[in-house]
Amino acid sequence: MDTTSLTASLSKATIAPTELARRAGVSRNTEWSLRRDPSRAKLGTLRELALACGLDIRIATVEASDPYAAAAARVMVGDLLAENVENQEQLTEWVARLRRWAPDAEPLQLTKMAAEVSAPQSRAGAIFLIGRHDPDRLASAAIASEQPWSLSGAPALDALGIEPISSASPTVLWTSAPAIVMGMLLSTHRKTTVASGANVIVAPLHQTVLAGGANLGGLELVSPVQAVIDSLGVGG
């Protein structure tokens, strides 16, 4: 749940914290805790806080794309060390969730489940491009950005000697600076708003994506299991 706007509203509220807590029907300590991090509050409590600030809450569903889902699957199949994941709480929750979804899942089933909820094209801030998708062109733009990056999807599968399911499987470029990299690619690419029409997906990098990766001939590539998860996520 994205509670950024509510957090900002609570911080700017002209109502005294004690009065805000009274109006919302919560203790002052609870109001203080939720002001810092409302993400774990019950929806009813969040609505009361919002109403006390003159706001209301609207819920909308979006395609899931949680990097910790992929990280959890990688930990479970031995492709990633748990201590290399920043947020242990999120990791633990996803490990438990995947086990609950399929208690006796084989590694491939785990990667498929993780792919459904961590797909690059569904990540907030992902950019869809049509143009050259050869690794050298994408790597040159990523290197020029001087930000962390790694290739996944088709080139990573190719490096592993794995044939993608679809010959049209897009290349995934994970980067800390999607907008900058896109700007460096516009001479050979054009932007599209349709993920299924793109052959290059430039997606915001999460730190777990880099763990276990390798540099092959100047190309930064994700780990084998991350490559499989990403490829399944984009349909390849």
Give the positions of each predicted feature.
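Short gly/ser-rich loop at a beta-strand->alpha-helix junction or flexible surface loop bordering the NTP-binding
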Residues: 101-206
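Conserved hydrophobic/aromatic packing and binding residues within compact polymer-binding modules
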Residues: 6, 20-21, 31-34
